[in-house]
Amino acid sequence: MSLTSKLSITDVDLKDKRVLIRVDFNVPLDKNDNTTITNPQRIVGALPTIKYAIDNGAKAVILMSHLGRPDGKKNPKYSLKPVVPKLKELLGRDVIFTEDCVGPEVEETVNKASGGQVILLENLRFHAEEEGSSKDADGNKVKADKDAVAQFRKGLTALGDIYINDAFGTAHRAHSSMVGVDLPQKASGFLVKKELEYFAKALEEPQRPFLAILGGSKVSDKIQLIDNLLPKVNSLIITGGMAFTFKKTLENVKIGSSLFDEAGSKIVGNIIEKAKKHNVKVVLPVDYVTADKFAADAKTGYATDEQGIPDGYMGLDVGEKSVESYKQTIAESKTILWNGPPGVFEMEPFAKATKATLDAAVAAVQNGATVIIGGGDTATVAAKYGAEDKISHVSTGGGASLELLEGKELPGVAALSEKSK
Protein backbone atom coordinates (compact mmCIF):
# COMPACT_ATOMS: atom_id res chain seq x y z
CA MET A 1 0.00 0.00 0.00
CA SER A 2 1.46 3.33 -1.03
CA LEU A 3 0.70 6.20 1.34
CA THR A 4 -0.59 8.22 -1.62
CA SER A 5 -3.06 5.62 -2.93
CA LYS A 6 -5.78 6.54 -0.44
CA LEU A 7 -8.99 8.35 -1.34
CA SER A 8 -8.89 12.03 -0.38
CA ILE A 9 -11.57 14.65 0.22
CA THR A 10 -11.01 16.15 -3.25
CA ASP A 11 -11.86 12.77 -4.85
CA VAL A 12 -15.41 12.58 -3.45
CA ASP A 13 -18.67 14.38 -4.25
CA LEU A 14 -19.91 16.07 -1.07
CA LYS A 15 -22.98 17.79 -2.51
CA ASP A 16 -26.07 17.35 -0.30
CA LYS A 17 -24.22 14.79 1.82
CA ARG A 18 -23.80 14.57 5.59
CA VAL A 19 -20.02 14.76 5.90
CA LEU A 20 -18.73 13.14 9.09
CA ILE A 21 -15.22 14.40 9.87
CA ARG A 22 -12.90 13.00 12.55
CA VAL A 23 -10.90 16.07 13.58
CA ASP A 24 -8.28 16.51 16.29
CA PHE A 25 -9.58 19.21 18.62
CA ASN A 26 -7.52 17.93 21.55
CA VAL A 27 -6.58 21.51 22.44
CA PRO A 28 -4.89 22.74 25.63
CA LEU A 29 -7.30 24.48 28.04
CA ASP A 30 -6.35 27.03 30.70
CA LYS A 31 -5.98 25.11 33.97
CA ASN A 32 -7.66 27.86 36.00
CA ASP A 33 -10.99 28.15 34.21
CA ASN A 34 -10.95 25.03 32.01
CA THR A 35 -12.76 26.89 29.23
CA THR A 36 -10.12 29.17 27.67
CA ILE A 37 -8.19 27.56 24.80
CA THR A 38 -4.51 28.44 25.25
CA ASN A 39 -3.44 27.31 21.77
CA PRO A 40 -6.08 26.98 19.01
CA GLN A 41 -3.58 25.58 16.45
CA ARG A 42 -5.38 22.24 16.07
CA ILE A 43 -8.70 23.95 15.33
CA VAL A 44 -7.02 26.26 12.81
CA GLY A 45 -5.39 23.21 11.19
CA ALA A 46 -8.77 21.59 10.51
CA LEU A 47 -10.35 24.68 8.91
CA PRO A 48 -9.37 23.96 5.27
CA THR A 49 -11.12 20.57 5.41
CA ILE A 50 -14.23 21.95 7.16
CA LYS A 51 -14.48 24.92 4.77
CA TYR A 52 -13.98 22.68 1.73
CA ALA A 53 -16.95 20.54 2.81
CA ILE A 54 -19.13 23.65 3.32
CA ASP A 55 -18.02 25.26 0.03
CA ASN A 56 -18.70 22.05 -1.88
CA GLY A 57 -22.35 21.85 -0.93
CA ALA A 58 -22.36 19.50 2.07
CA LYS A 59 -25.80 19.26 3.67
CA ALA A 60 -24.21 19.11 7.13
CA VAL A 61 -20.65 18.96 8.45
CA ILE A 62 -20.43 16.80 11.56
CA LEU A 63 -17.24 17.09 13.59
CA MET A 64 -16.13 14.46 16.09
CA SER A 65 -13.05 14.56 18.31
CA HIS A 66 -11.56 13.58 21.64
CA LEU A 67 -10.19 15.91 24.30
CA GLY A 68 -7.85 14.75 27.05
CA ARG A 69 -8.21 11.40 28.79
CA PRO A 70 -11.61 11.10 30.48
CA ASP A 71 -11.14 7.28 30.53
CA GLY A 72 -14.49 6.31 29.09
CA LYS A 73 -16.63 8.37 31.47
CA LYS A 74 -18.48 11.67 31.13
CA ASN A 75 -16.40 14.40 32.76
CA PRO A 76 -17.29 18.11 32.32
CA LYS A 77 -13.59 18.97 32.66
CA TYR A 78 -13.00 17.38 29.24
CA SER A 79 -16.06 18.72 27.44
CA LEU A 80 -15.57 19.99 23.88
CA LYS A 81 -18.07 22.80 24.56
CA PRO A 82 -15.29 25.44 24.99
CA VAL A 83 -14.30 24.80 21.36
CA VAL A 84 -17.64 26.12 20.06
CA PRO A 85 -17.05 29.91 20.45
CA LYS A 86 -13.56 29.61 18.94
CA LEU A 87 -14.83 27.53 16.02
CA LYS A 88 -17.69 29.99 15.39
CA GLU A 89 -15.21 32.87 15.37
CA LEU A 90 -12.79 31.12 13.00
CA LEU A 91 -15.48 29.88 10.59
CA GLY A 92 -17.62 33.00 10.75
CA ARG A 93 -20.77 30.87 11.01
CA ASP A 94 -23.00 29.17 13.55
CA VAL A 95 -21.97 25.88 15.17
CA ILE A 96 -24.44 23.55 16.88
CA PHE A 97 -23.12 21.55 19.84
CA THR A 98 -24.63 18.19 20.84
CA GLU A 99 -24.42 16.91 24.43
CA ASP A 100 -23.41 13.43 23.25
CA CYS A 101 -21.71 11.94 20.19
CA VAL A 102 -24.20 9.11 19.47
CA GLY A 103 -27.87 8.37 20.07
CA PRO A 104 -31.33 9.34 18.79
CA GLU A 105 -31.10 13.02 19.81
CA VAL A 106 -27.78 13.48 18.01
CA GLU A 107 -29.16 11.69 14.93
CA GLU A 108 -32.21 13.97 14.95
CA THR A 109 -30.03 17.12 15.12
CA VAL A 110 -27.84 15.87 12.28
CA ASN A 111 -30.73 14.79 10.05
CA LYS A 112 -32.56 18.13 10.49
CA ALA A 113 -29.46 20.13 9.51
CA SER A 114 -29.09 21.67 6.06
CA GLY A 115 -27.15 24.33 4.13
CA GLY A 116 -23.72 23.22 5.33
CA GLN A 117 -24.64 23.46 9.03
CA VAL A 118 -21.63 22.69 11.24
CA ILE A 119 -22.29 20.37 14.19
CA LEU A 120 -19.72 19.59 16.88
CA LEU A 121 -20.29 16.38 18.83
CA GLU A 122 -19.36 15.95 22.49
CA ASN A 123 -16.09 14.18 23.39
CA LEU A 124 -15.89 10.68 21.86
CA ARG A 125 -13.87 9.43 24.82
CA PHE A 126 -16.81 9.94 27.21
CA HIS A 127 -17.69 6.47 25.87
CA ALA A 128 -15.45 3.52 26.76
CA GLU A 129 -16.33 2.11 23.33
CA GLU A 130 -14.23 4.77 21.56
CA GLU A 131 -10.87 3.52 22.85
CA GLY A 132 -12.15 0.03 23.61
CA SER A 133 -11.54 0.33 27.35
CA SER A 134 -12.13 2.51 30.40
CA LYS A 135 -10.63 2.76 33.88
CA ASP A 136 -12.35 1.72 37.10
CA ALA A 137 -12.20 3.62 40.41
CA ASP A 138 -8.78 2.07 41.17
CA GLY A 139 -7.34 3.11 37.82
CA ASN A 140 -7.38 -0.43 36.38
CA LYS A 141 -8.16 -0.91 32.69
CA VAL A 142 -11.56 -2.44 31.97
CA LYS A 143 -12.19 -3.77 28.47
CA ALA A 144 -15.32 -2.44 26.77
CA ASP A 145 -18.04 -4.93 25.88
CA LYS A 146 -17.67 -6.17 22.29
CA ASP A 147 -21.35 -5.73 21.41
CA ALA A 148 -21.37 -2.25 22.96
CA VAL A 149 -18.38 -1.29 20.77
CA ALA A 150 -20.22 -2.55 17.67
CA GLN A 151 -23.32 -0.52 18.68
CA PHE A 152 -21.23 2.61 19.29
CA ARG A 153 -19.60 2.27 15.86
CA LYS A 154 -23.04 1.81 14.31
CA GLY A 155 -24.15 4.98 16.12
CA LEU A 156 -21.27 6.99 14.63
CA THR A 157 -21.86 5.51 11.16
CA ALA A 158 -25.53 6.63 11.32
CA LEU A 159 -24.42 10.29 11.43
CA GLY A 160 -22.83 10.53 7.99
CA ASP A 161 -22.97 9.65 4.31
CA ILE A 162 -19.25 10.20 3.77
CA TYR A 163 -16.42 9.81 6.31
CA ILE A 164 -13.36 12.07 6.34
CA ASN A 165 -10.38 11.47 8.63
CA ASP A 166 -8.36 14.58 9.38
CA ALA A 167 -6.89 13.51 12.73
CA PHE A 168 -3.37 12.35 11.93
CA GLY A 169 -2.31 12.60 15.58
CA THR A 170 -4.49 9.59 16.46
CA ALA A 171 -3.99 7.64 13.20
CA HIS A 172 -1.83 5.09 15.03
CA ARG A 173 -4.74 4.19 17.35
CA ALA A 174 -7.36 1.65 16.26
CA HIS A 175 -10.13 3.61 18.00
CA SER A 176 -13.77 3.42 16.91
CA SER A 177 -13.83 6.87 15.30
CA MET A 178 -10.63 6.02 13.37
CA VAL A 179 -11.44 2.53 12.09
CA GLY A 180 -15.06 1.75 12.98
CA VAL A 181 -17.14 4.07 10.80
CA ASP A 182 -18.66 1.86 8.12
CA LEU A 183 -19.45 4.16 5.20
CA PRO A 184 -18.86 3.38 1.50
CA GLN A 185 -16.44 6.28 1.04
CA LYS A 186 -13.77 6.97 3.65
CA ALA A 187 -11.30 9.67 2.63
CA SER A 188 -8.48 11.72 4.09
CA GLY A 189 -8.91 15.41 4.88
CA PHE A 190 -6.27 17.96 3.84
CA LEU A 191 -4.16 17.56 6.99
CA VAL A 192 -3.91 13.78 6.73
CA LYS A 193 -3.41 14.01 2.96
CA LYS A 194 -0.45 16.38 3.42
CA GLU A 195 1.08 14.14 6.09
CA LEU A 196 0.81 11.08 3.84
CA GLU A 197 2.21 12.92 0.81
CA TYR A 198 5.27 14.16 2.69
CA PHE A 199 6.00 10.86 4.41
CA ALA A 200 5.66 9.12 1.04
CA LYS A 201 8.20 11.63 -0.33
CA ALA A 202 10.69 10.52 2.29
CA LEU A 203 9.92 6.83 2.66
CA GLU A 204 8.89 5.81 -0.85
CA GLU A 205 10.76 7.99 -3.36
CA PRO A 206 13.18 10.39 -1.65
CA GLN A 207 15.28 12.80 -3.66
CA ARG A 208 18.87 11.94 -2.83
CA PRO A 209 21.08 12.44 -0.87
CA PHE A 210 18.59 11.52 1.87
CA LEU A 211 19.56 12.43 5.45
CA ALA A 212 17.92 11.45 8.73
CA ILE A 213 18.74 13.45 11.88
CA LEU A 214 17.86 11.45 14.97
CA GLY A 215 17.99 12.71 18.54
CA GLY A 216 16.28 11.63 21.72
CA SER A 217 17.60 10.08 24.88
CA LYS A 218 17.54 6.32 24.39
CA VAL A 219 18.93 4.25 21.53
CA SER A 220 16.56 1.44 22.52
CA ASP A 221 13.53 3.74 21.90
CA LYS A 222 14.72 4.52 18.39
CA ILE A 223 15.95 1.09 17.32
CA GLN A 224 12.94 0.27 15.08
CA LEU A 225 13.19 3.71 13.54
CA ILE A 226 16.92 3.35 12.81
CA ASP A 227 16.40 -0.17 11.47
CA ASN A 228 13.69 0.96 9.07
CA LEU A 229 15.61 4.04 7.89
CA LEU A 230 19.10 2.57 7.38
CA PRO A 231 18.28 0.82 4.08
CA LYS A 232 16.66 4.06 2.82
CA VAL A 233 18.99 6.93 3.83
CA ASN A 234 22.40 8.08 2.56
CA SER A 235 23.48 9.77 5.80
CA LEU A 236 22.47 9.60 9.42
CA ILE A 237 23.22 12.21 12.09
CA ILE A 238 22.93 10.71 15.56
CA THR A 239 22.62 13.42 18.18
CA GLY A 240 20.91 14.30 21.47
CA GLY A 241 21.23 12.15 24.57
CA MET A 242 21.51 8.87 22.68
CA ALA A 243 24.77 9.98 21.01
CA PHE A 244 26.58 9.42 24.35
CA THR A 245 25.73 5.72 24.26
CA PHE A 246 27.31 5.52 20.78
CA LYS A 247 30.40 7.54 21.76
CA LYS A 248 31.13 5.58 24.92
CA THR A 249 30.47 2.17 23.36
CA LEU A 250 32.23 2.70 20.03
CA GLU A 251 35.06 5.10 20.86
CA ASN A 252 35.36 4.79 24.62
CA VAL A 253 34.82 8.54 25.04
CA LYS A 254 34.46 9.59 28.69
CA ILE A 255 30.88 10.82 29.10
CA GLY A 256 30.85 11.81 32.80
CA SER A 257 27.32 11.56 34.15
CA SER A 258 25.68 11.98 30.72
CA LEU A 259 22.83 9.70 29.73
CA PHE A 260 23.94 6.14 29.05
CA ASP A 261 21.51 3.54 27.76
CA GLU A 262 22.73 0.12 28.93
CA ALA A 263 20.25 -1.84 26.78
CA GLY A 264 20.96 0.40 23.80
CA SER A 265 24.72 -0.04 24.13
CA LYS A 266 24.36 -3.70 23.15
CA ILE A 267 22.90 -2.83 19.73
CA VAL A 268 25.10 0.12 18.80
CA GLY A 269 27.67 -2.14 17.09
CA ASN A 270 24.97 -3.77 14.95
CA ILE A 271 23.63 -0.38 13.90
CA ILE A 272 27.06 0.72 12.70
CA GLU A 273 27.58 -2.61 10.86
CA LYS A 274 24.21 -2.24 9.15
CA ALA A 275 25.06 1.36 8.21
CA LYS A 276 28.30 0.17 6.58
CA LYS A 277 26.43 -2.54 4.70
CA HIS A 278 24.07 0.09 3.26
CA ASN A 279 26.85 2.65 2.62
CA VAL A 280 25.32 5.10 5.07
CA LYS A 281 27.55 7.87 6.35
CA VAL A 282 27.05 8.11 10.14
CA VAL A 283 27.76 11.50 11.72
CA LEU A 284 28.28 11.63 15.49
CA PRO A 285 29.02 14.69 17.65
CA VAL A 286 32.66 15.44 18.53
CA ASP A 287 32.29 18.15 21.19
CA TYR A 288 29.84 19.03 23.95
CA VAL A 289 28.40 21.78 26.12
CA THR A 290 28.48 20.35 29.63
CA ALA A 291 26.75 21.14 32.93
CA ASP A 292 27.20 20.16 36.57
CA LYS A 293 23.45 19.58 36.94
CA PHE A 294 20.31 19.31 34.81
CA ALA A 295 19.19 22.92 35.25
CA ALA A 296 19.20 26.23 33.39
CA ASP A 297 21.40 27.81 36.10
CA ALA A 298 23.98 24.99 36.03
CA LYS A 299 27.69 25.70 35.91
CA THR A 300 28.57 25.04 32.27
CA GLY A 301 31.71 23.82 30.53
CA TYR A 302 32.98 22.55 27.18
CA ALA A 303 34.52 19.19 26.30
CA THR A 304 35.90 17.48 23.21
CA ASP A 305 36.10 13.74 22.54
CA GLU A 306 39.81 13.76 23.43
CA GLN A 307 39.30 15.50 26.78
CA GLY A 308 36.12 13.62 27.58
CA ILE A 309 33.40 14.95 29.87
CA PRO A 310 34.71 15.18 33.46
CA ASP A 311 33.07 13.26 36.30
CA GLY A 312 30.21 15.18 37.86
CA TYR A 313 29.38 16.85 34.52
CA MET A 314 26.88 15.82 31.86
CA GLY A 315 26.56 16.76 28.19
CA LEU A 316 23.36 18.74 27.58
CA ASP A 317 24.13 20.05 24.08
CA VAL A 318 26.64 19.48 21.29
CA GLY A 319 29.42 21.99 20.59
CA GLU A 320 30.35 24.15 17.60
CA LYS A 321 32.54 21.58 15.82
CA SER A 322 29.66 19.10 15.85
CA VAL A 323 27.28 21.79 14.59
CA GLU A 324 29.66 22.53 11.69
CA SER A 325 29.64 18.90 10.59
CA TYR A 326 25.82 18.78 10.91
CA LYS A 327 25.49 21.93 8.80
CA GLN A 328 27.71 20.49 6.09
CA THR A 329 25.76 17.21 5.99
CA ILE A 330 22.45 19.11 5.87
CA ALA A 331 23.68 21.41 3.08
CA GLU A 332 24.59 18.48 0.83
CA SER A 333 21.24 16.67 1.29
CA LYS A 334 18.09 16.93 -0.83
CA THR A 335 15.64 15.20 1.55
CA ILE A 336 16.01 15.69 5.30
CA LEU A 337 13.99 13.96 7.97
CA TRP A 338 14.49 15.35 11.47
CA ASN A 339 13.30 13.56 14.59
CA GLY A 340 14.83 14.68 17.88
CA PRO A 341 16.79 17.81 18.91
CA PRO A 342 20.58 17.83 19.60
CA GLY A 343 20.32 19.49 23.02
CA VAL A 344 18.06 20.37 25.93
CA PHE A 345 16.65 23.32 23.97
CA GLU A 346 14.10 24.15 26.69
CA MET A 347 17.01 25.62 28.67
CA GLU A 348 18.66 28.62 27.01
CA PRO A 349 22.33 27.65 27.74
CA PHE A 350 21.78 24.32 25.92
CA ALA A 351 19.66 25.48 22.97
CA LYS A 352 22.42 26.71 20.66
CA ALA A 353 22.97 23.58 18.56
CA THR A 354 19.23 22.99 18.18
CA LYS A 355 18.74 26.54 16.91
CA ALA A 356 21.74 26.20 14.55
CA THR A 357 20.40 22.88 13.19
CA LEU A 358 17.01 24.50 12.61
CA ASP A 359 18.65 27.44 10.80
CA ALA A 360 20.55 25.00 8.58
CA ALA A 361 17.31 23.12 7.83
CA VAL A 362 15.55 26.38 6.89
CA ALA A 363 18.48 27.31 4.61
CA ALA A 364 18.25 23.86 2.98
CA VAL A 365 14.56 24.44 2.19
CA GLN A 366 15.46 27.78 0.61
CA ASN A 367 17.98 25.91 -1.54
CA GLY A 368 15.34 23.51 -2.80
CA ALA A 369 15.60 20.61 -0.33
CA THR A 370 12.58 18.96 1.32
CA VAL A 371 12.73 19.05 5.13
CA ILE A 372 10.27 17.02 7.19
CA ILE A 373 10.08 17.42 10.96
CA GLY A 374 8.59 14.33 12.60
CA GLY A 375 6.35 15.69 15.34
CA GLY A 376 7.01 15.67 19.08
CA ASP A 377 9.90 17.71 20.51
CA THR A 378 11.26 18.75 17.12
CA ALA A 379 7.88 20.22 16.16
CA THR A 380 8.08 22.22 19.41
CA VAL A 381 11.50 23.50 18.28
CA ALA A 382 10.06 24.76 14.98
CA ALA A 383 7.20 26.46 16.86
CA LYS A 384 9.50 27.99 19.50
CA TYR A 385 11.62 29.74 16.87
CA GLY A 386 8.70 30.62 14.57
CA ALA A 387 9.98 28.44 11.73
CA GLU A 388 6.92 26.26 11.06
CA ASP A 389 6.13 27.97 7.75
CA LYS A 390 9.79 27.86 6.68
CA ILE A 391 10.03 24.05 6.85
CA SER A 392 8.50 21.92 4.06
CA HIS A 393 6.43 19.91 6.52
CA VAL A 394 6.08 19.83 10.30
CA SER A 395 4.12 16.71 11.26
CA THR A 396 1.15 17.14 13.59
CA GLY A 397 1.42 13.63 15.01
CA GLY A 398 4.28 12.66 17.30
CA GLY A 399 3.36 9.01 17.91
CA ALA A 400 1.74 8.54 14.50
CA SER A 401 4.70 9.92 12.56
CA LEU A 402 7.12 7.82 14.62
CA GLU A 403 5.18 4.63 13.82
CA LEU A 404 5.10 5.48 10.10
CA LEU A 405 8.85 6.05 10.14
CA GLU A 406 9.29 2.72 11.93
CA GLY A 407 7.62 1.09 8.94
CA LYS A 408 4.35 0.29 10.70
CA GLU A 409 0.95 0.56 9.08
CA LEU A 410 -1.31 3.12 10.76
CA PRO A 411 -4.79 1.70 11.49
CA GLY A 412 -6.48 5.05 10.78
CA VAL A 413 -4.83 5.20 7.35
CA ALA A 414 -5.35 1.53 6.51
CA ALA A 415 -9.10 2.00 7.18
CA LEU A 416 -9.45 4.63 4.42
CA SER A 417 -10.80 3.67 0.98
CA GLU A 418 -8.33 3.15 -1.86
CA LYS A 419 -8.55 5.47 -4.87
CA SER A 420 -10.23 3.63 -7.72
CA LYS A 421 -7.69 2.80 -10.39
UniProtKB/Swiss-Prot annotation:
Pfam families cross-referenced by the UniProt entry: PGK
Reactions this protein catalyses: (2R)-3-phosphoglycerate + ATP = (2R)-3-phospho-glyceroyl phosphate + ADP
Binding site for (2R)-3-phosphoglycerate: V23, D24, F25, N26, Q41, R42, S65, H66, G68, R69, L124, R125, H172, R173
Record flagged with keyword Cytoplasm: yes
UniProt xrefs under PANTHER family: PHOSPHOGLYCERATE KINASE
Record's subunit section: Monomer.
Full protein name: Phosphoglycerate kinase
Species whose genome carries this gene: Emericella nidulans (strain FGSC A4 / ATCC 38163 / CBS 112.46 / NRRL 194 / M139)
